[in-house]
From Swiss-Prot:
This is Protocadherin beta-10. PANTHER family: CADHERIN-87A, PROTOCADHERIN BETA-10. SMART domains: CA. The chain crosses the membrane at residues 691-711. GO terms for molecular function: calcium ion binding. GO terms for cellular component: plasma membrane.
Amino acid sequence: MAVRELCFSRQRQVLFLFLFWGVSLAGSGFGRYSVTEETEKGSFVVNLAKDLGLAEGKLAARGTRVVSDDNKQYLLLDSHTGNLLTNEKLDREKLCGPKEPCMLYFQILMDDPFQIYRAELRVRDINDHAPVFQDKETVLKISENTAEGTAFRLERAQDPDGGLNGIQNYTISPNSFFHIKISGSDEGMIYPELVLDKALDREEQEELSLTLTALDGGSPSRSGTSTVRIVVLDVNDNAPQFAQALYETQAPENSPIGFLIVKVSAEDVDSGVNAEVSYSFFDASENIRTTFQINPFSGEIFLRELLDYELVNSYKINIQAMDGGGLSARCRVLVEVLDTNDNPPELIVSSFSNSVAENSPETPLAVFKINDRDSGENGKMVCYIQENLPFLLKPSVENFYILITEGALDRELRAEYNITITVTDLGTPRLKTEHNITVLVSDVNDNAPAFTQTSYTLFVRENNSPALHIGSVSATDGDSGTNAQVTYSLLPPQDLHLPLASLVSINADNGHLFALRSLDYEALQAFEFRVGATDRGSPALSSEALVRVLVLDANDNSPFVLYPLQNGSAPCTELVPRAAEPGYLVTKVVAVDGDSGQNAWLSYQLLKATEPGLFGVWAHNGEVRTARLLSERDAAKHRLVVLVKDNGEPPRSATATLHLLLVDGFSQPYLPLPEAAPAQAQADLLTVYLVVALASVSSLFLFSVLLFVAVRLCRRSRAASVGRCSVPEGPFPGHLVDVSGAETLSQSYQYEVCLTGGPGTSEFKFLKPVISDIQAQGPGRKGEENSTFRNSFGFNIQ
């Protein structure tokens, strides 16, 4: 009574809300959909967005969800596509049993504004079950004086499928005594009757065995069989008679196992064996056989399994009484299950938000549904929350309730509420269900983020790797929730010439600073910028701080060799007299370092030599000197690789390559040996080759000049003609050198060579091409061949 008064006292508080909510529910519709049973999980049912006339993405924006009446999630909604899908395989027989059509009811809930769409899903049957007889053999005792046309009712087969997939026909194996007749029952089911066509004669045949077949209407059809054994008896005049054709009784659903449901009674006026009556279930389903049992001698029916009103609220039981002579009679027992208050109310929360802003009155916090599986007064419910709370329960349709704030909340007075939702039924004794929820009151955004320091100084060594973490900034916010979530950003620099966006970046979530590229101390020694911290409140509040970045110098410059040049041009060859004394200064490697301090201190080291021990390099000045006397057995050509290393950490280095040629005096001309020349040629053979080569070059030069003049005089009109000449083969040609680097002269170009000599020097000088019309061959090839020539021999072409 107190609960009912409490409910009435709140009616006036929620009346205006109920009326307001009725406006939002006025557009709610009713949807009917269908799906075939046993379809795979995730099968498409319908596109709810199109069916409800909503734009794409609207379902997700409104927080749409699907709620079933029995709290089982048979369906799944993809709110992004709007597709309603099956969440599991649906078995119509398990869901609805023999009931047809099989309907599942559910609701579609939507927010902003809150709406409920009621819908139903029909599960269409498929022929996935074959008919099954409970008894594989049925025994009929028929007297031999039974009249033709007498019908004997047989137990029907069971088929969980419904409609056309259920049982549609019965047949009997061919015989001369019986045929099958199909009859209907009050429940709309068909059952077989065995009709006698010809009188039986016990003396001719005492027993017959027939096969009864049940056929369903599926495609393809399924069938089940049972054996009917007929025993022919002597004359039995009277069949048993029940005291009542219909027995009606009631049983509470909490009745214990073994509880006596009812006792049926039948009498037979015959005597002896023909008067002995036995009782049995007839045409009973498996559910009846597992729930009840019958005493075959007394006719008492007992409870074999506990009853459940919520599953089955009534039973129809067919009882057969048969005497010893095979005659039988039937009656029906109707058992009504009485409901007891054995199910507490259920509370199903569909949506819940545990946080509400302090300045948000009449805000929905939770949507839930209540249900009680009991019936009558046992299934009636009241729902309420504690007194003195700034919240209201607003009733809706289909037993839905919405928990909303009654007015604006004050976080400074109370930041958290523990609400108990109580649902009580009106049964005896009363059962109740409680559900506790916690609501947090969130603060408004009234505090700006504050940096831990007003300015930050960061140090980073130059040549850092890109994306290097160089430091962090941090800010805190006194608010809570999203108002306290800080986002960091780089503010535009005051120096417009500073490319800040390409220098550093900041992690928006944690304030970590990263160098976007490698910094160069020589280019940029320091820079500063400002960072901002902004919360996620509305409106957003922010603050800023100064960040200074100092770049530290590093040993990032390798030594650079000034002499000899190492720029890819032809190598420079130094001449060394064979008469040089030990310690003779051959040349000096000159190098510089762009760094400063100890990073620029250079040391020299001989890394590789054609003949180790012949030359040495001074460590501090790079001078290359002979280490011992030269002999005739020493190779004429030598290649030295000098390592130049600075004193940085880690040290950096460069190499210089020197080409040395041992000569017997500076007055003799020399020619750098091609790479293919033997490195171990004897000195005397080299001298002979040089003399022969010089003579050959002189002769060929003179012959070329004469040939050129002759061709010019004979063919004045052909300015682009090219002179030809033969060049003797050999490792050292005479006065002609092939600019392509081969041992014979190219067919495209010939050059005049002038060999000049002076004290201590000797060089080749190319005056001009013998063929003047170079344009006919193409400027590109000229440049390419000249470049190849210079790179191969290091000579200057004029």
